[in-house]
Amino acid sequence: MYEQAIVIRNDLKMGKGKMAAQACHASIQAFLHAQKISSSAVSGWMNEGQKKVVLKVNSEKELLEIFKNVNIEGLPCSLIRDAGRTQIEPGSLTAVGIGPEKEEKISKVKKDLKLL
């Protein structure tokens, strides 16, 4: 089974629409990265219904730690930096997208995170 995980910073107090937009940015960018490095995972994920899970962290430090661990594992990923046109400061790190990849690989880096 394949999945994609999206990790959102909860401490920024973004509105629901803003969080949804940041999650979409993270999902698309991670997907594009996955197409380059893991086409078999992308195909599997597409054929299985494109499962996604959205998780939260409470600080930029936690988000960067997740991003570092994802890179150590060699998973396709994205780190989203907001342009700052609406609710938050320009350059704020808002989200990380992980995968698509096999669930067991993503589980290594998301194991302690709570659902958004």
Curated annotation (Swiss-Prot):
Listed InterPro entries: Pep_tRNA_hydro_II_dom_sf (IPR023476), Pept_tRNA_hydro_arch (IPR034759), PTH2 (IPR002833)
Subcellular location: Cytoplasm
GO cellular component, one term: cytosol
GO biological process, one term: translation
A GO molecular-function descriptor: peptidyl-tRNA hydrolase activity
First-tier enzyme category under EC: hydrolase
Entry's EC annotation: 3.1.1.29
Top-level taxon of origin: Archaea
Catalytic activity: an N-acyl-L-alpha-aminoacyl-tRNA + H2O = an N-acyl-L-amino acid + a tRNA + H(+)
Keyword terms, alphabetized: Cytoplasm, Hydrolase
Location (main, coarse): cytoplasm
Matches recorded under Gene3D superfamilies: Bit1 (3.40.1490.10)
SUPFAM superfamilies to which the protein is assigned, alphabetical: Peptidyl-tRNA hydrolase II
Protein purpose: The natural substrate for this enzyme may be peptidyl-tRNAs which drop off the ribosome during protein synthesis.
Family: Belongs to the PTH2 family.
HAMAP family in the record: Pept_tRNA_hydro_arch (MF_00628)
The name this protein goes by in its record: Peptidyl-tRNA hydrolase
Organism: Methanococcus maripaludis (strain DSM 14266 / JCM 13030 / NBRC 101832 / S2 / LL)
Gene: pth
